[in-house]
Each structure stands twice: as structure tokens, then as C-alpha cells.
Amino acid sequence: ERNDAARLRDGGYDAQWNDDFHNVLHVLLTGETSAYYTDFADRPAERLARCLAEGFIYQGEGSANHDGTPRGTPSAHLSPTRFVSFLQNHDQIGNRALGERLTVLTDPAKLRAATAVLLLAPQIPLLFMGDTDGSETPFLFFTDFHDDLADAVREGRRKEFAKFDAFADPQARARIPDPNARSTFEASRPEPGPDAATWRALYRDLITLRMTHIVPHLAGAMAIGAEATGDAAVTARW
């Protein structure tokens, strides 16, 4: 979230998660632009191009989600292998009110294209459990708290979603599963989706391509450039 490139200098961390990659692709895949996605709602293809070429999208620009406060530091000088990219992870799914995966939020063709970007770009790809099986089961926010803490977490979570358009109505927020209920945990077990074999084959093919044609050239890799070529299309070169 801070997009602090200083942590990736020599002697620091080898790589860090890049939430900007997830956020801009989520906007392109789902059309959602509420809350922190507002920072990526405008010209998302251009923002994705910057992400692929330079790492962070926000490199000191003001964040609409944070009332214009500047976010991030310059990162274009860093190798793409300093960034960990992902379409889903436990935070981004689990922090959704209903824990939906991209398999139920967008159409398969778009998700296949995004998966190809994830696995064939030089950044380090991160996969979340259930991705390779096309799982459609939710991954909900669940805890094992009790008494006052359990009540505070339950109500605090519902208040948190008041800023999302879909949960502005208190009745809608009442549908958010109780994090402390056993049923919330049980519902979060990943199960193979109806097209699991197709998704496994796609991942197998893309990972093979990555190992054969991408990984041997990652040492010293740097971006040459990237640009948007349409409302949801990007050309990138490394």
C-alpha cells in the first residue's frame, strides 16, 4: 500500500507484493470502482501499462482514496523481478464482504487473459489456493474470537463496508457473514470449480511457457516500455 521502493534497495528486501497490479486488473476485470479502487478507475489500461513497465502505479501521486495524500516513491529503476504480482490473495478476497473470487466476478475469457499476463510477465507471480482449479467457493474473513472481541470484530467489519456502494444500506451489511461463525470457516474451503480441468490445463501450459521462454532471460531484466493500445489493452516490452 505504501509503495516504498526504498525497501527494495540492495541489502533490503528481494521483492514485495505489488497491490497496484491487483487493483488495476481488478478494475479492468470487474468494473468495480468503489473505495480503494477509485485510485484505479480512471484510465486503467494506462495505469496497467505503467505497472508492467515501472512496478508501482503510484510513485508519489495523490491518492483519491486518501484525500489526495501522495502515495508511493519512484520505482521505474527497479527490475521487474523486484515485484510480486497476483490476481487474488487471502487479503484481497478475504477482505471482500462476501469473499467472492474472480471466477464469479468476471467472465472466463477476461480471467484467462489476466492469468496469461500474470504468468508470462517477468514479475514474480503469486497464485492463491484454488486458482488453478477455477474454484468458485468464497474465501471469507473468519476468526476464532470470543465475547467482546468477537462482537467488536463482527460490527467493525460491517461498518467498514459502509463506504462501498453495494453495502451502503444497513440491510445489505447485515448479510455479511459473521467472522466468528463456524459456518463462515467451513464455507471457505476451496473446492474445484466446474471447469477445473480446463483451468488446470491453462495453468500448466502457461507455467511451461514461463519456465521455457521467460525464466532463462530474467537475470538483469528491465522494461523497455509499455503503453495502452485500447480501453482494456496494453503492449509491454522488456
Functional labels for PLM-detected ranges:
Residues 58-70, 127-129, 133-142, 167-238:
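Glycan-recognition and catalytic regions of carbohydrate-active enzymes
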